[in-house]
Structure formats: C-alpha cells, structure tokens
C-alpha cells in the first residue's frame, strides 16, 4: 500500500481533489467534520445524516455514491462524540475505513479524518494510527501457501489529508510506514514454521 500526504487549506480545497473515494468523519448527534462539510455541496451527506442512515457512533460507515464532482464516493465514518474522541474511537474509525477500502473496486482513496480531534494526542499520532490500521488490513500471511489469496481488489494508493505538509509531517509519515513495515516483518516471521525460522 502506497501512502502520500496532501495539505488542504483555503488555497487548496478538498473539493478540488480527484479521488475514487474520500473518507470523512461524522460525529454523534449528526455533526459533520470540516472536510465533510466542505464536500457536502449538494446536501447529500447532510441528508444521509438526517435520515438516520449513519449515527456517528465509532466505526459505523455509510458509503455515498455521487453522480457529479471529483470524488466518485464519499465514505462517512463515525468518530463518536465530537468533544471526546478517544484513541480507541479513532482507531476503530480508521479500521472501519480500511475494511471498506478493501472491498472497493477502486485503486485510490483518501482519508480526510480530523487528525487533531483525538483527546490527548497530536496529529502525528493520528497519522501513525491511520497508516498502521490500513497496513494491518492488507497484511496476508500466505508466503508458504501454494495458492496465494487474491488481494488484487481494494484501494492500494492512499492519500492522507493533513493541515500542513511540513518536514515534521513528512517525517511522521516515513516513521509510520517504517513502523508498519517492521510490524509486517514481525508477523511474517511469527507465522513461519520452526524449521524455516
């Protein structure tokens, strides 16, 4: 899985980013995150909230197909209460995104969850949580199988939305990918039989 970061601000709006699927956050009580509000130009996301199709509870998802715009699909993801998004709720939301991304018939996707919403954590921690959860979802221990699992489907290129794409954020992404690589290697070695490892 390939990761990249993209900063969105007033000059570079999220509505101008072309993607097969953009995952945005929804809070309990029917509140859209900033990215979701920006993408809700025709009111489809707000209507989905009002209809009760998604509650905003952590890990709940709703895929909305769009007929126009640069994004073909918007994935609404529940984050829990807006004033108290815990580590667990955020990780649960990212794992839910990973499950949906694995089933999509698309090659690219974007995570635009609010990185600064997690209580007691910074944006770099949230970035690391996103990378690790997405990489865990695609890990397969099929190195010794005669017929490997078919994993061709699903999102393979993920863009992570950030507020600022400075050197510290790029370093945090590189460290997150390195950590995920180490976790994959540990799992691979742990799954090998004793006569090989």
Task: Tell where the protein language model's regions lie, with residue ranges.
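Short amphipathic alpha-helical segment within the helicase RecA-like ATPase core
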Residues: 1-197
